[in-house]
């Protein structure tokens, strides 16, 4: 208004500047809108903000170690004086109760006692293990009825002189030969240097007139034929092994003599094989 009055010129004396305030609804709406706006929060810069980033920065990134030195900052140590240290004097030997005395003088006696206890324990454990193993092995052995069947009783009076009789014993052929006096003298006169498997005739018999053998050839397990071959004893038809009347190999591929089983004479007319 003042600039208009200044430029009016001749109308200036009759002009005057006035101002009037008029209330409007827009002012009330602006005041209400200003009052509804929340005030921004005020943060305390002195108080640390706890967040994942701030806490991760304070966490240790290397293994924790303890350092001791002159330039290391000191720490507070909390010690307790109310803890009782256990006393093991009741379990210790009298020779080592004195802290000011060396225990080397009694070390030999203490070691000897320890060795004695260890040895006694080892002997006891060994004996117990031996008993267990013996019982286990004996449980797998043949029973009494099986052992009884493993023996055969032969009546010698049924075998005439100069003849050979075959029996079945433990699934194998058993030869019982009643030798003549001529055969006994002939086999006893054989020199050991002539034999492939040197063995004297008297070492293979308990009674010279009775020759008991297992009738299995020592070459490949064939059954020899009695009273046959070049030496009048046994002959293997499979590969031509010749045995004499004492069952000793004399010719052919067989490497060993015929096997002599375990037997026992229970009388003049009875023998038990097995």
UniProtKB/Swiss-Prot annotation:
Ligand binding ([2Fe-2S] cluster): 217, 219, 236, 239, 241
Transmembrane segments: 104-140
GO cellular component annotations of the record: mitochondrial inner membrane; mitochondrion
Principal subcellular localization: mitochondrion
GO MF entries: 2 iron, 2 sulfur cluster binding; metal ion binding; ubiquinol-cytochrome-c reductase activity
Substrates-to-products reaction catalysed: a quinol + 2 Fe(III)-[cytochrome c](out) = a quinone + 2 Fe(II)-[cytochrome c](out) + 2 H(+)(out)
This protein's encoding gene: UQCRFS1
Compartments where found: Mitochondrion inner membrane
Keyword set includes Membrane: yes
Additional remarks: The Rieske protein is a high potential 2Fe-2S protein.
Cofactor(s) essential for the protein: [2Fe-2S] cluster
Signal peptide start-end: none
Keyword terms, alphabetized: 2Fe-2S, Disulfide bond, Electron transport, Iron, Iron-sulfur, Membrane, Metal-binding, Mitochondrion, Mitochondrion inner membrane, Respiratory chain, Transit peptide, Translocase, Transmembrane, Transmembrane helix, Transport
Topological region Mitochondrial intermembrane: 141-274
Protein name: Cytochrome b-c1 complex subunit Rieske, mitochondrial
Tagged with keyword Iron: yes
Topology within the bilayer: Single-pass membrane protein
Disulfide bridges in this chain: 222-238
Cofactor note (record): Binds 1 [2Fe-2S] cluster per subunit. Fe-S cluster delivery to the Rieske protein is mediated by components of the iron sulfur (Fe-S) cluster assembly machinery that reside in the mitochondrial matrix (including HSC20 and LYRM7).
Pfam families, alphabetized: Rieske, Ubiq-Cytc-red_N, UCR_TM
């Amino acid at each position: 208004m003042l600039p208009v009055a200044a430029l009016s010129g001749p109308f200036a004396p009759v002009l005057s500047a006035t101002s009037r305030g008029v209330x409007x609804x827009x002012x009330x709406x602006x005041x209400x809108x200003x009052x509804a706006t929340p005030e921004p929060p005020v943060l305390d810069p002195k108080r640390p903000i706890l967040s994942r980033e701030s806490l991760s920065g304070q966490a240790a990134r290397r293994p924790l170690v303890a350092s001791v030195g002159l330039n290391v900052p000191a720490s507070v140590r909390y010690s307790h004086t109310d803890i009782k240290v256990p006393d093991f004097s009741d379990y210790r030997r009298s020779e080592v109760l004195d802290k000011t005395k060396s225990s080397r003088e009694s070390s030999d006696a203490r070691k000897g006692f320890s060795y004695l206890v260890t040895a006694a324990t080892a002997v006891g454990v060994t004996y117990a293990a031996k008993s267990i193993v013996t019982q286990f092995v004996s449980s797998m052995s043949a029973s009494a009825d099986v052992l009884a069947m493993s023996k055969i009783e032969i009546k010698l009076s049924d075998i005439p002189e100069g003849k050979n009789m075959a029996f079945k014993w433990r699934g194998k052929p058993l030869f019982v030969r009643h030798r003549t006096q001529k055969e006994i003298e002939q086999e006893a006169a054989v020199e050991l240097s002539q034999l492939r498997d040197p063995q004297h005739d008297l070492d293979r018999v308990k009674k010279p007139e009775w020759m008991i053998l297992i009738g299995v050839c020592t070459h490949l397990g064939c059954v020899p034929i009695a009273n046959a071959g070049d030496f009048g004893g046994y002959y293997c038809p499979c590969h031509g092994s010749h045995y004499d009347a004492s069952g000793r190999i004399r010719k052919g591929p067989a490497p060993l003599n015929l096997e002599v089983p375990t037997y026992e004479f229970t009388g003049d007319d009875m023998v038990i094989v097995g």
